[in-house]
C-alpha cells in the first residue's frame, strides 16, 4: 500500500494572508498539523530544513515535540543539509529523537538545496578541504553520521576511567534507525550512489538534469536505476522510495479562491537553471479530485514510488492544510493503491 505523507516547507513571514507570522507560529503549527494528519490517517509528517531563511532550521527539537504529541505517524525531514552537520552529533540527536518517537523517524539527508547564504556552512565552521566540493563535504559528514548510527567505535576509551582501550560507540543507539535514513537525490547518478550506500531514495519535485522526457518519466528512470543498483549491492533489506508532488484538490469555494486561477505554467513541467545547471521541475496537480487522480495515475514516478509526499502551503494554517490532506486521503489516495 502506498504511503502518503505531507511535506511542509515551514515558511513564516508577517505578510498579509500568512497565518505563520513568526517562527513560533511555524513551529507550533507544524506540531498541530502532525496531530491532525495522524487523526486523518496520513502516514507521514515531514519538514524541510533550511538555514539563514525564514523556515525551519533545527529539526530535532521539532521532531521530538511532534513525537510527543502523536503515536503512529512517521516523522521525517526532506532534507537535512549535511554540509552544516557534525555527523557524530547528528547521530546522537537522531537516535535520541527516534527513541522518543518509538522508532518512527524517517530522516532525509543530502547536500541540500540552493540557499540564501553564500557558502553558509563555512560560517558554521565546515569548510571544504582543498580540492573538495561542498557536495564532497556533505557526503563526508553523512559517512560519519551513518557510522555513528551503526554503532561503530568512534573515540578511544580513557583507560583510567573505563579500564579499557577499546573504541567507544556513540550513545544512545536506536535499533533500526540506520535503515530509515534517506538520501535526497536530484540526479540519476546520485541515485546510484544512494543505493551503493544503503540509504532509501528521496526524490523531490525537481531533478538537476533534463533529457527532454516528461518529469515523471525521468524520475521513474532514476527510481528504476536506484532499484537495479540496490539489487546488486548486497543489502539484506528492501529500500523505500519517495517522490514529492504539489497536489491541490479543489472541492470548496475556499479552495477555488486560493488555487482556481493558479498560473497555467505551474500545471506543466518547467525547465530552468539551479546553481548554473539545467533542471526539470515537476508540475502542480490542481483541480477536481477525479482530474488529479487521472493525472497522477499517468505519472510514472508516482506509481513507481512506495511513498508520496504532498507539499503543503503551510502559511495557510493548520485547519486549511488539514482540509487539503483530508480531501487527498478520502478522494485521491484510494485510487493510487
What kind of region is each of these model predictions?
Residues 1-73:
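N-terminal beta1-alpha1-beta2 module of alpha/beta enzyme domains
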Residues 2-23, 84-154, 209:
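Flexible, glycine-rich active-site loops centered on histidine and acidic residues
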Residues 4, 41, 49, 66, ...:
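Conserved, mostly hydrophobic/aromatic
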Residues 4-8, 45-47, 75-78, 105-109, ...:
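Hydrophobic faces of well-ordered beta-strands that scaffold small-molecule active sites
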Residues 13-27, 80-87, 177-185, 280-289:
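Active-site mouth loops of central-metabolism enzymes
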Residues 44-66, 81, 205-216, 311-320:
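Glycine-rich, proline-tolerant flexible connector loops at the mouths of alpha/beta enzymes
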Residues 124-130, 142-146, 215-226, 317-337:
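C-terminal helical cap(s) of enzyme catalytic domains, especially alpha/beta-barrels
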Residues 130-170, 203-204, 211-305:
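An alpha-helical appendage that flanks or caps ligand/catalytic pockets
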